[in-house]
Amino acid sequence: MKKLIAAALLGILSIAHIIAQEKSKPNVLFIAVDDLKPVLGCYGDKIIKTPNIDRLAKMGTVFLNNYCQQAVCGPTRASLLTGMRPDVTKIRDLHTKMRDINPNIVTLPEYFISQGYTTSGIGKIFHPSCVDKKFDPQSWSIPFLVAKESDYSNGLPVQKHYQSPELKALNAKEEVLTAQDGKGKKKSKKEADDEEGARGPAFECLDLPDDSYDDGVSAKLAVKQIEMLNAAKKPFFMAVGFRKPHLPFVSPKKYWDLYKREDMPVAEFQEHAANSKIFSYQYPGELTNYSGVKEFAKFDKNEANEFGLAIDKQKELVHAYYAAVSYTDAQVGILLNTLEKLGTLNNTIIVLWGDHGWHLGDHDMWGKHTNYEQATKAPLIIAAPGLKAGQTKSMTEFVDVFPTLCELSGGKVPAYLDGKSLVPVMKNNKTSVKEYAMSQYPRKMDKADINKVEDGKGKLMGYSMRTEQYRYTVWLKNFTSDQAYSADKVYTKELYDYDKDPLEKVNVSDDKKYAEIAADLDKKLVAYFKSKEVKL
C-alpha cells in the first residue's frame, strides 16, 4: 500500500514538474504587418508617428539591415514561417500552395506545438492563396480566429476594405462588380477586381472607430484570445497579422490628422538607374487597380515601365501610407498593454516584422515586386526576456527568424533550416552571423530578347546578394538555385555601391573600377548556388 501511495505521489510530482516546466517557458507574441517598410521612428524616420512600435524597439533588438527573401507576400511569408528559402518552399508566386509541393514541411507554429505550446492566430499570417483554407489549419492547435460581421462597429467593410456610405450603396446595387464587358456578358468578381481602377479607391479617410476596419477588429479579438491563453496551464504562441499598410490605405481620420500633407516626403530619385535593364523595374499595376490614381500619371502601362505620378498625388499617397502605419501602430500598442496588464510582458518573446518593403515613388515605382533596396529591406524587431535592448547593423534576413525563436524559447534548432539564429547578435550587437542577405525575384527578359530564346518565354530569376556595402544582382535564364549552376545561364548583372550611391542611381557592374569587387561577389554567389544545388 505504501508503495502504491509513493508511486502515485511520484506520478503527481512528475506531472506537476512537467506543468511547471511548460509554464516557465516564455510565451511568444508574433506580429506580422503587411507591406510595412522601415518607415518607423526606431528606424530613423523623423516624420512618422509610431510610439508603440518604438516602445517595443526600446525593449528589444532592432535589426537595421534586415531583408526579405522575395518581395511579395506569399513567398516571403512562406520563407519566414518555414525558415526555408523560396527555392525550397517552391513558393515564388501567389497561387502555389505550400503543402501541395511540400506536404510535410514544418511551419514555425507547428514547431511550437511540438514544444508544448498552444498556438493561435488571427489576421494575415500566411498569404491566404498559398496555404490550405487560407491559414494552414495544421499550424494551429486551436481554431484560427476569423472575425464576424458583429465584430465590426460599423458593419462589414465593402470589398473587405471600405466603410464609405457611397461605396456601400453602390455595392448593394451591385453596380461595382457586375459591370458589362461590352458584349453583354457579366464579369466575374475576379475579372472585375483585375481591371485597372476596379477595386475602389486607393485610400479612405473617415471619422470612425478603429474596429470599423480589419486591424482594429483583429487587435480586439487578439486581446480576448491572449487573456484566455494566459489563464491556461501551457505557454502560448499567439500570431497576429495586421493588414495595413497594404493597399488600399484605409484608416480612421484621427491617424490622417497626425500629419500635414505638405510635410509628406517624396522620393529624391525617381528615375531608372543608369545602365540598368527595363525588366528589373515594375509598372505599378497593383496601385492602378485602385481608382483615383492612373489619371494623375504621365504614362499608361508601357514597355518602358514608366509611370510619372504627379507630385501632389504622390504626397497624398504617402500621407495615406503613413496614416495606415500609425493606425497599425496603435493596434500594436493595444497588444503590448494587454501583456503588461496581465503581468506577462516580461515573460513573452515579441517579434514584429513587415513582410517586405515598398517603393514609395523611388525609381518611379509604387509597390514591391523588385530586387531593389526599397522593396527588399524590411523591419524586424525582437524582444526577449533577459536580453538587453539595442540596435544592430548586422546583416539579417527573414529565414533567420525561425531558428532565432527556437533558441530563445529553449528549443533545439532544426539543422535543416536555411537561416541562422540571431541570438548571438541580440547578445552582442557588434557581432554578425552572416556576411550577406539573399533575395530573389522572377522576371522575363526585355521584349527584344525574348524572341531570341528557344522557348520564346524568356524566364529569368534574379538573385540579389546584399552585403554591408554592395548589392550584387545576377539575372539567370531558366534557373533556380536548386539546379546546377553554369555561367552560360547569366543574362545580365547589376551592382550598386551604397557607400557612394545610396539611392541606386548607377549600375556599375561593367565599370572597370569595380572589376575586382564584382569578381569577389560573383565568387560568393556561385558558392551560394553550389551549396543549394540539389544532387540527383
What role is predicted for each listed range?
Residues 2-9, 13-487, 491, 502-527:
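Formylglycine-dependent sulfatase
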Residues 495-496:
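Short hydrophobic beta-strand that contains or immediately precedes a catalytic carboxylate
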